[in-house]
Curated annotation (Swiss-Prot):
Domain of life (superkingdom): Bacteria
Residues at which ATP binds: G38, Q39, S40, G41, S42, G43, K44, S45
Subcellular location(s) per record: Cell inner membrane
GO molecular function, one term: ATP binding
Role description: Non-canonical ABC transporter that contains transmembrane domains (TMD), which form a pore in the inner membrane, and an ATP-binding domain (NBD), which is responsible for energy generation. Confers resistance against macrolides.
Listed PANTHER family: MACROLIDE EXPORT ATP-BINDING_PERMEASE PROTEIN MACB (PTHR30572:SF14), MEMBRANE COMPONENT OF TRANSPORTER-RELATED (PTHR30572)
Native source species: Campylobacter fetus subsp. fetus (strain 82-40)
Protein name, per record: Macrolide export ATP-binding/permease protein MacB
Stretches assigned to the ABC transporter domain: 2-240
Family of this protein: Belongs to the ABC transporter superfamily. Macrolide exporter (TC 3.A.1.122) family.
Keyword Membrane among UniProt keywords: yes
Length: 641
């Protein structure tokens, strides 16, 4: 079964090579009960580690069932430990966070057993070892003898064809020690190959064969009894399946969650950077979307799909006063274009509003029967202007809410006569309050442009023309057509245009750019949080080196260790991300209830992206600690306290 040929093992300490095993030749048959005895430093523990595939020889050949495993790779050795060996340690090496049955069932996870099969088998073994009342007991509530019996049960979980016992009674009192040796003797008679490493001759006396080692050499090999028992029962090999892989992944998830729970405060502090980062990003996006929607809504209220024409070369043109102003004929011509729904000339005049011995300065905006609709204003009370008002220059006026509040706070203004620059006007309508972010608090009234021309200013020129395009018309194409028509009519381009769609697109682009910029700044906090996760995971790997060694000893492969720590990092970030989303919603609720003129708008996409980003951070920043954990040498990890 086991054959060692000229096995040597050297260690380099301080640049000096020290040979611990000096050419060991040994053969152990199936079903033997062997004791390897020797003083401290004799090399017996090193020999046991090589026999159990926890360590590799410097040179020589190790044959297991006629298979040369001395050159096996790390995961191949893990597979051998999983299927062939069971380890019983002096200090038990139970996981303190797992109860008794979970400690025993642990090797079954890496063997691909289903959860039900693992637990049932673990309980069966514990019952045979007299621990039927301790299934759910934590290791720190067990006596030394009970803990060692749990360790034996764990070694038998995957069959334990070869049991390697390192000073199995070293930490026990004499009666518990005898009980453990009786169990090992019984297992030998069941056909298990037992290899005990000890310095105690009384313990070695239980074995049928005693091998003494000194200074790295075997100095004696004596047999008391040549009887060999055949293994009566062994587990069938479990073939990997999709369900087994899924169950193993789930168990890694559960173990990772348990590790996080066991250090609640540290885990929360680790998540804090992720929480703040995710909440910041989501809030920034929600604020950007809310403010963008508010501004675009304001633009819509001002009139969508509109084009306005002004005289001059642009706003602030010092020579615009010399430019021949736009005319009513220009407005009428543009109103007849196929793609124009309607057109209205516009004029603005400042003056004094007077009613019942009260006077306030205000603005008079003049236009056609379409001007209020084009501007996105709606009548709250009364009526809009009619064609008759325009044709006959009626002295009718429509007031806004500020004018009503100033003169008619508790009175219905419809039908009342108000003066503008001493000219009487009858109030026929009241517009709804303009809630846009562009509205001011000035008193504003509206009149037919013909009335303003004929009864107030006498000026035939207009300051702008506003066009409402038909639905489905491309605003940019329409704008170019309007420019060409006016250039031909006026002989030159002494005017400029303002396209509401262009303004909308510019604002959207600006808001998106600002949102990206601020989100980029918020992402920095996510990166800082990710680095924090990596630091804590590196500390966790260092603190749990012993646990990693135990898992590797019972058969965990590098990928199993890496998966567990990677899942742990992803979980930390995902939980932190979820809390961050909750925090963002709480902030949004408070803002929307007590905030200003606009609401924070959360999008489903931003939430999924936030969760995805937090998980990605877990993968990226958890990779290095997980890789470090997976690269640990089993024996080095086991020996670290």
């Amino acid at each position: 079964m086991i054959k060692l040929e000229n096995i040597k093992k050297s260690f380099i300490t301080g640049g000096v090579s020290s040979e611990v095993l000096k050419g060991i030749n040994l053969e152990i048959k199936k079903g033997e009960f062997v004791a390897i005895i020797g003083q401290s430093g004799s090399g017996k523990s090193t020999l046991m580690n090589i026999l159990g595939c926890l360590d590799t020889p410097t040179s020589g050949k190790y044959l297991l069932d006629s298979l040369d495993i001395s050159k096996f790779k790390k995961d191949e050795l893990s597979n051998l430990r999983l299927k062939k060996f069971g380890f019983i340690f002096q200090r038990y090496n139970l996981l303190s966070s797992n109860d008794t049955k979970s400690n025993v069932a642990l090797p079954g996870i890496y063997a691909g057993m289903s959860k039900a099969d693992r637990i049932n088998r673990a309980k069966d073994i514990l019952v045979k070892l007299g621990l039927e009342t301790k299934f759910d007991t934590m290791p720190n509530h067990l006596s030394g003898g009970q803990q060692q019996r749990v360790s034996i049960a764990r070694a038998l979980m995957n069959g334990g064809e070869i049991l390697l016992c390192d000073e199995p009674t070293g930490a026990l009192d004499s009666s518990s020690g005898v009980m453990v040796m009786q169990i090992l003797d019984s297992l030998h008679k069941d056909g298990h190959t037992i290899i005990v490493v000890t310095h105690d001759k009384d313990i070695a006396a239980w074995a049928d064969r005693i091998i003494e080692i000194k200074d790295g050499n075997i100095i004696s090999d004596t047999r008391k009894n040549s009887q060999i028992y055949e293994l009566k029962q062994n587990l069938k090999e479990i073939k990997p399946s999709l369900k087994a892989i899924r169950d193993q992944f789930f168990e890694s998830f559960v173990m990772s969650l348990g590790a996080i729970k066991s250090h609640k405060l540290r885990s929360f502090l680790t998540m804090l950077g992720i929480i703040i980062g995710i909440a910041s990003v989501i809030c920034v996006v929600a604020l950007a979307k809310g403010s963008q929607q508010k501004i675009l809504s304001d633009i819509n209220n001002m009139g969508t799909n509109t084009i306005t024409i002004f005289p001059g070369k642009g706003f602030g043109d010092m020579h615009s006063g010399r430019v021949r102003s736009l005319s009513i004929d220009d407005s009428n011509l543009l109103g007849k274009l196929d793609f124009v729904d309607f057109s209205t000339p516009r004029m603005n005049t400042s003056g004094l509003l007077t009613y019942a011995n009260q006077s306030f300065s205000g603005s008079l905006r003049s236009g056609s029967e379409y001007s209020l609709a084009i501007s996105g204003l709606k009548i709250e009370k009364g009526r809009d202007f009619t064609k008759d008002d325009i044709i006959n220059s009626r002295s009718n006026i429509i007031i806004d809410q500020f004018t009503k509040d100033a003169f008619f706070k508790d009175v219905d203004p419809i039908g009342k006569v108000i003066l503008f620059n001493k000219q009487p006007f009858t109030i026929v309508g009241l517009v709804k309050r303009d809630e846009t972010s562009f509205s001011g608090d000035n008193l504003t009234v509206y009149a037919p442009y013909t009335t303003t021309m004929n009864k107030l200013t006498g000026d035939r020129d207009i300051r702008s023309i506003m066009l409402k395009l038909k639905d489905g018309v491309n605003a940019q194409v329409a704008e170019q057509s309007i420019i060409e028509v006016l250039k031909i009519r006026r002989g030159s381009k002494d005017f400029f245009t303002r396209n509401s769609d262009t303004i909308r697109q510019t604002i959207e682009s600006t808001m998106n750019t600002m949102s990206l910029l601020i989100s980029g700044i918020a992402l920095i906090s996510l990166m800082v949080g990710g680095i924090g996760v990596m630091n804590i995971m590196l500390v966790s790997v260092f603190e749990r080196t012993k646990e990693i060694g135990i898992r590797m000893a019972i058969g965990a492969k590098s990928k199993d260790i890496m998966t567990q720590f990677l899942i742990e990092a992803i979980l930390l970030c995902a939980i932190g991300g979820s809390i961050g989303i909750g925090l963002a919603y709480a902030i949004g609720y408070g803002f929307n209830v007590f905030g200003g003129d606009f609401k924070m708008i959360f999008s489903t996409a931003s939430i999924f992206i936030a969760l995805g980003v937090s998980s990605l951070i877990g993968i990226v920043f958890g990779y290095i600690p997980a890789r470090n954990a997976s690269k640990l040498n089993p024996i080095d990890a086991l020996l670290r306290e």
